[in-house]
Amino acid sequence: ALERGLPFLGVCRGHQELNISRGGTLYQKVHEVPNMMDHREKDSTAPNEIQYGPHHDVKLVPNTWFEKSLGVSEFWVNSLHGQGIKTLGKGLAPLAHAPDGLVEAMYCTDVNQFTLSMQWHPEWLTHENPLWIKIFEMYGDACRDFRAAHRSHRV
C-alpha cells in the first residue's frame, strides 16, 4: 500500500506490522516489562460492551494533524494486545501514547499519502464513539481522494 501510494489504516496487528516492516521492534509480552501496563484482554467471556469497552486513556501528541483532526487531546480506548511497539521503525512518528508510554497510534512521516495506525480497535463499538467514526471518515476521504486522482490519469 505504501509503495503504491495507497491510503493506509492499520489496526492492532496492522499497527505492529507497519512498525516491523520499517525496521521497528516489539515487546513480545508488554505485561512482563517493568513499569508497563497489562494491555491484554481482561475477560474473554465478558459481554462485548465490557470486553471491547474502554480500558485505558491515550494522550495525543500535541499539535499533530491527528490531534487537530479529532479536536481532543486524550480519550479512552479498548485494549486487547499482548505485544506492543518497543522501538519505532524508520519514518514513523507517534501520534498517541498509553499512560505507560507505549505508542498507541503513529503515522509515516516519509510518504505523501494518508497513513494512520493504532493499537486499539476502532471498529468495535463504533456506534458509541464519534472519534472512531471520525477516524474512518478520514480514511474514507483519503481513499476517495486517491481514487479520484487516479481516475483523472486514465486514458
Task: Set out the residue ranges of the language-model regions.
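Catalytic nucleophile loop
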Residues: 1-25, 121
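Amide-donor transfer/coupling interface in amidating biosynthetic enzymes
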Residues: 1-6, 31-155
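Short hydrophobic/aromatic-enriched beta-strand-loop microsegments
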Residues: 26-30
